[in-house]
């Protein structure tokens, strides 16, 4: 019987510079998913690579005093070496400067032109060089790029355009009938409400103002727009041929099962890419997942901000698997995660050194101390053993359920419950006490056998996330690798096996002070220019009549997520938000248009008064209130919880306004 196929891709990394840990996270995440699918028995093809054309790269190469090709060769090599360092098990590393890719892109452009989907015209508007994106004046936010926030420059040039509107209705229908296509759901709502439903404009797909790109073969003064070039890597990398001579690999693997990308480029992958595929008469990918960002304490990592942490530096301090564990475990499903050196040390000590490393070391050491390393199941059981076994055997299904939904961080948490339960089992059975009683030797042997078996099961599940650690643990236990199917049974470790007599420390505890001293030597802190602090203004709040606690307790506060938002027509102050609270979605109208764009609101966690009587604002029903605060200058900001502990909040401490006050009506 042939294995089911699974084709997973990352967004190809842009070759503008050395990748930081935020860029690297995506490759590690894709690798964990690919490894788990292989464990499940899938025939996996995992593709990653580098995006190497565009005006930004041409300018960077000029600054460096090298040719564009020399520049991308160097950076692509850096990216590949980092992916290899992080133990990513990709099957194909594609470069958009590969000759076969470039030829197919030219053919694809020509085919779309011949079909009438591409036509020649003149482009006039705004262009963001870092994002390689075109915008109209109305799409800019305060005159800047809506994606990255950098300044845009006017652009006017002859160009080819793609008729996006031709396929818009078909794409909308596809998204409606395939709810799994764009994930998480908040990203889908953003694409539908902000781009597709308002109507698509034709897309500029060529440039003449720079040369570093793939020439349009029938009009060589034009180069192909970088996103048309880059997106097609997903098909050219597995052997797509525009003339119909597709490779066996393409016929087997397409459509892709998962495009894993950053949330900042989801528009290109869920609007442009599927429309390009429709033009080529190819099936659409099954799912596009826009993962959140890994932030460095004070925001998104950026070389210009000077807050970058690099993967190879982290590996030098902590090791590959510790870094893999951190980035996979600390990234929520749909919220940004945070990485700092201090957090890395904390996780290293508490979870890797204590929970996992100490468990393995203690178990092996006790096996050597009491039985010369021989691990035997003597069958002397107690009720606590049954509890341990049933708990451990319940975990694989939980991990599988989490991985099916791409909740990788939650899956790792489930795996570590096995190691925590084994540590608890040591406290419950007290092997050191059993060792003092000659009559309890068989019971002691059984306890140690159960520990070794539990570690083997947990370690097998750990293999997708920390592959080297898995090999090291199994090697020390003298245990063979298992399949996920094997994990349905407790007791497969061969009784009488002998563990190593020289246990190695898997993860050493680290001193935060020493680590930070070395980090500061590596990256000396920048001296911030001293600024005179403006005199703080004390805001006089108009006294309101006192209320009793019982009055306050009547209010119900819940945390929700804004999944869609739009400006209220004919209102200068109102935004209408769709807020997901638990399993329900509420419509809430707020007078915050002067402070937030609809795009900024989408994805925000907000606090909502949910038992407020529904009211109409500007003729639109509002089913609650989003809580806000106001500073001395009258600026309003949404109250956003740092994290969600639970949906219902018993109390809160903030200043609130009536709907009519904040709406200004």
Question: Where in the sequence are the language-model features?
Answer:
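A glycine-rich helix N-cap at a beta->alpha junction
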Residues: 76-91
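Beta-strand segments within the central parallel beta-sheet cores of soluble alpha/beta enzyme folds
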Residues: 287-290, 474-476, 576
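N-terminal catalytic cores of NTP/NDP-binding nucleotidyl/phosphoryl-transfer enzymes
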Residues: 2-75, 94-109, 114, 131, ...
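Helix-rich, typically C-terminal accessory recognition domains appended to large enzymatic cores
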Residues: 120, 343-380, 391-499, 609
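Cys/His-rich short segments
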Residues: 115-168, 172
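Structured secondary-structure scaffolds
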Residues: 2-48, 100-104, 148, 154-369, ...
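Intrinsic disorder at enzyme termini
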Residues: 473-551
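Phosphate-backbone binding interfaces of nucleic-acid-interacting proteins
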Residues: 530-665
């Amino acid at each position: 019987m042939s294995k089911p196929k699974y084709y997973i891709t990352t967004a190809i990394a842009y070759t503008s510079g050395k990748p930081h840990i935020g860029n690297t996270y995506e490759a590690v995440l894709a690798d964990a998913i690919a490894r788990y699918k292989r464990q499940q028995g899938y025939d996996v093809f995992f593709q990653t690579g580098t995006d190497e054309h565009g005006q930004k790269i041409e300018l960077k190469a000029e600054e460096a005093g090298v040719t564009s090709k020399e520049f991308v060769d160097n950076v692509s090599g850096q990216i590949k070496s980092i992916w290899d360092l992080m133990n990513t098990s990709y099957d194909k590393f594609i470069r958009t400067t590969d000759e076969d890719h470039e030829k197919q892109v030219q053919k694809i452009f020509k085919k779309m032109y011949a079909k009438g989907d591409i036509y020649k015209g003149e482009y006039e508007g705004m262009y963001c060089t870092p994002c390689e994106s075109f915008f109209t004046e109305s799409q800019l936010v305060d005159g800047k790029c809506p994606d990255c926030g950098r300044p845009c420059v006017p652009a006017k040039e002859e160009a080819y355009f793609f008729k996006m509107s031709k396929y818009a209705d078909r794409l909308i229908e596809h998204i409606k009938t395939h709810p799994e296509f764009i994930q998480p759901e908040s990203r889908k709502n953003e694409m539908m409400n902000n781009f597709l439903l308002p109507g698509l404009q034709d897309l500029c797909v060529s440039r003449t103002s720079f040369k570093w790109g793939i020439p349009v073969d029938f009009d060589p003064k034009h180069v192909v727009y970088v996103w048309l070039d880059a997106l097609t890597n997903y098909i050219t990398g597995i052997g797509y041929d525009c003339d119909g001579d597709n490779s066996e690999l393409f016929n087997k693997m397409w459509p892709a099962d998962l495009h894993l990308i950053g949330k900042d480029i989801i528009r290109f992958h869920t609007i442009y890419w599927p429309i390009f595929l429709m033009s080529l008469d190819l099936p659409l990918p099954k799912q596009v997942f826009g993962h959140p960002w890994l932030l460095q304490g004070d925001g998104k990592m950026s070389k210009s901000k000077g807050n970058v942490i690099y993967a190879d530096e982290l590996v030098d301090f902590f090791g590959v698997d510790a870094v893999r564990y951190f980035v996979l475990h600390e990234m929520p499903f749909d919220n940004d995660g945070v990485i700092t050196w201090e957090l890395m040390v904390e996780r290293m000590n508490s979870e890797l050194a204590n929970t996992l490393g100490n468990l393995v070391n203690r178990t092996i050491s006790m096996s050597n101390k009491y039985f010369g390393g021989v691990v035997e199941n003597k069958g002397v059981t107690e009720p606590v053993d049954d509890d341990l076994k049933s708990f451990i055997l319940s975990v694989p299904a939980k991990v599988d359920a989490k991985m099916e939904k791409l909740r990788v961080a939650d899956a790792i948490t489930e795996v570590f419950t096995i190691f925590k339960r084994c540590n608890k089992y040591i406290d419950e059975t007290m092997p050191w006490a059993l060792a003092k009683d000659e009559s309890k030797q068989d019971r002691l042997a059984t306890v140690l056998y159960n520990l070794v078996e539990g570690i083997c099961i947990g370690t097998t599940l750990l293999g997708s996330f920390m592959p080297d650690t898995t090999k090291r643990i199994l090697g020390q236990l003298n245990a063979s690798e298992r399949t996920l199917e094997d994990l349905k049974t407790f007791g497969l470790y061969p009784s009488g096996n002998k563990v190593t007599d020289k246990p190695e420390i898997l993860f050493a505890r680290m001193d935060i002070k020493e680590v930070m001293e070395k980090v500061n030597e590596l990256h000396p802190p920048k001296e911030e220019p001293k600024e005179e602090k403006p005199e703080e203004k004390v805001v006089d709040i108009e006294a309101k009549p006192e209320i009793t606690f019982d009055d306050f307790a009547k209010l119900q506060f819940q945390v929700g997520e804004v999944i869609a938002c739009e400006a209220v027509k004919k209102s200068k102050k109102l935004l209408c938000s769709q807020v997901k609270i638990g399993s329900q979605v509420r419509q809430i109208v707020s007078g915050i248009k002067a402070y937030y764009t609809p795009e900024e609101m989408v994805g925000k966690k907000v606090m909502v008064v949910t038992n407020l009587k529904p009211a109409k604002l500007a003729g639109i029903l509002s089913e609650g209130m989003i809580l806000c605060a106001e500073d001395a200058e009258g600026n309003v900001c949404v109250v956003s919880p740092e994290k969600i502990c639970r949906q219902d909040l018993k109390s809160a401490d903030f200043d609130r306004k009536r709907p009519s006050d904040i709406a200004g009506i």
